[in-house]
């Protein structure tokens, strides 16, 4: 993502003061990581984003072998690697306005992850909005949410 931002700066047709980012699920995790590493994003929207890799490991038994392989070990073996990938551990470093959506019954990424992140964002007085609604569909958005995103990005 950061290389794409570098490319955008070289293009005359891109308003580099108004680059927004949108991520769903693991893409949400990547959005959080980009916001931590780079300040060029104007606003970001995250839907059902992974915010706590250790919690994700604990809650998703079906993903444990994949996470262990990708990260190189378990949370017990490599706590710093899981923390490095978890926005809840460094929410104080996020300085980009965030619009976060999460469904209450998401069975892929627990709403507890979003709640935990929002608690840290609030504690650190960050600029965010948090929208939850009843649904068990991972990454679900309602028509009204799409309109909210459009308006929010334009302000």
Give, region by region, the residue ranges found by the protein language model.
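Mobile cap/lid helix-loop segments that gate and shape the active-site cleft of serine hydrolases
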Residues: 54-90, 96
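Alpha/beta-hydrolase active-site loop
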Residues: 1-12
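Short beta-strand/loop motif that positions the catalytic acidic residue
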Residues: 94, 100-102, 106
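Short glycine-enriched nucleophile-adjacent loop
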Residues: 28-39
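Conserved alpha/beta-hydrolase "acid-adjacent" motif
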Residues: 107-113
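Active-site nucleophile loop of the alpha/beta-hydrolase fold
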Residues: 45-55
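Alpha/beta-hydrolase fold nucleophile elbow
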Residues: 14-24
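C-terminal catalytic histidine-bearing segment of alpha/beta-hydrolase fold enzymes
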Residues: 115-155
């Amino acid at each position: 993502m950061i290389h794409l931002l570098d490319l955008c700066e070289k293009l005359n047709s891109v308003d580099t003061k108004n680059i927004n980012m949108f991520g769903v699920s693991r893409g949400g995790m990547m959005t959080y990581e980009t916001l931590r590493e780079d300040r060029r994003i104007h606003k970001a929207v995250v839907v059902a984003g992974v915010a706590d890799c250790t919690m994700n490991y604990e809650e998703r038994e079906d993903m444990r072998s994949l996470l262990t392989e990708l990260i190189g070990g378990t949370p017990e073996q490599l706590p710093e690697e899981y923390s490095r990938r978890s926005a809840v551990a460094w929410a104080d470093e996020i300085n980009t306005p965030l619009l976060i959506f999460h469904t209450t019954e998401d069975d892929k990424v627990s709403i507890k992850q979003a709640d935990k992140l929002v608690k840290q964002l609030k504690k650190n007085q960050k600029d965010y909005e948090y929208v939850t609604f009843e649904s068990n569909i991972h990454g679900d958005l309602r028509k009204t949410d799409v309109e909210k995103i459009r308006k929010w990005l334009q302000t």
